[in-house]
A protein has these predicted regions:
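Cytosolic regulatory regions of ion transport systems
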Residues: 1-351
Length: 351
């Protein structure tokens, strides 16, 4: 065990992870990363803390997914959103509707027509294919275009793609599990939040804890209930129950009734591409969010390459610091000499 650089305790049971970490720490593992569901262990006055078990880093899947969902709510016209350089740069995915002014035009033409919008089209996801576009690549209907841009240009890039930016005010969450409760607690001060929970006991219990959230004791798949709650007036619907089939069905149902933004949470990645094709606006997985957190922690410790993975496209985003002794650069390159298998999304120089 002393030769182990990292011990990753990633089971779904907190107690098993704690014991594994303690044994690994006792046997001399250099670094220990632990996955925990219960966020109470992070509280200052917690009886049990990660430090007591020799844990260096803790990853909370629900918390990671919560952050991703909140980012999507702030930019509701996007289906994927990742931040770089402490939020100064963003990579966002936008699905192109038939009415998008980009359809039928190539990348070079769009760049020439919009010289004052700083952006880079980094990736296109088209059906089951993900590829790096070229200057003559034409945009097609239902393409998911991934743009890299400064945060200050978010509204401009969405307008360029034919999306009308709108602000979310009314949010409905289905499922009062860990993720649903955390979202409601975080969002209730800034939005009008309603949360649906079919378990009467649980609904009554969380109703006492969420003072600014309307807790609805009902079945989120009941059409009569949804119409009585004027579901069509909801700006955002988040399907966050523990059953991903229920989440998928609920998402399709409310999308049919005209909810502007539907965010679906699923555990596995099997359904990602399928649900995107049938009209779900954004898909989030707490497991993928947790994987990203683990990768960032390891890369950060090694001062190596921070890697961001995306849920359903075969692309990684890498942040590379170029120095005189950089082991990844053996010779000088110009942009024209780069392989077609990757592109440079942005360069930070002198801040």
């Amino acid at each position: 065990m002393k030769n182990i650089d990292y011990l990753l305790a990633l089971t779904r049971i907190d107690e098993v992870n704690f014991v594994s970490c303690y044994i690994a720490h006792f046997l001399g593992a250099k670094k220990i990363i632990c996955r925990l569901r219960n966020t109470e262990y992070s509280h200052r006055n917690a009886t049990i803390t990660a430090e007591q078990f020799g844990i260096d880093h803790v990853v909370y899947p629900e918390r990671a997914a919560q952050q991703e969902i909140e980012n999507l709510i702030r930019e509701p016209s996007t289906i994927d959103l990742q931040e770089f350089k402490n939020g100064k740069v963003k990579m966002l995915g936008i699905q192109l509707d038939p009415s998008s002014p980009l359809i039928g035009r190539n990348v070079a033409n769009i760049e020439q027509s919009n010289p004052y919008i700083p952006h880079k089209l980094a990736v296109i996801n088209r059906g089951d294919i993900t590829f790096i576009p070229h200057k003559d690549t034409k945009y097609k209907v239902n393409d998911i275009a991934y743009f890299v841009l400064p945060t200050t240009a978010l509204n401009e890039i969405q307008s360029m793609a034919g999306k009308s930016p709108f602000k979310v005010k009314n949010i409905m969450i289905m499922g009062a599990g860990k993720l649903g409760r955390s979202l409601a607690k975080s969002l209730q001060e800034d939005y009008n939040v309603r949360i649906i929970e079919h378990n009467h006991t649980k609904a009554k219990k969380i109703g006492k804890k969420l003072s600014n959230t309307l807790v609805l004791d009902a079945d989120g798949l009941d059409v009569d209930f949804l119409t009585s709650e004027n579901i069509e007036e909801a700006d955002c619907f988040i399907a966050a129950t523990e059953n991903e089939q229920t989440n998928i069905l609920a998402s399709l149902l409310v999308k049919h009734y005209g909810v502007k933004q539907v965010i679906l949470h699923i555990t596995t990645t099997n359904y990602f591409r399928a649900v995107r094709r049938i009209g779900i606006d954004a898909v989030v997985s707490k497991n993928i969010s947790a994987v990203n957190e683990v990768l960032k922690l390891i890369r950060s410790d090694q001062q190596d390459l921070p890697v961001t993975r995306f849920e359903d496209i075969d692309i990684d985003a890498i942040e590379l610091t170029v120095s005189t002794d950089c082991k990844y650069l053996r010779k000088r390159y110009t942009l024209e000499q780069l392989s077609e298998e990757y592109c440079i999304g942005f360069i930070t120089r002198n801040n």
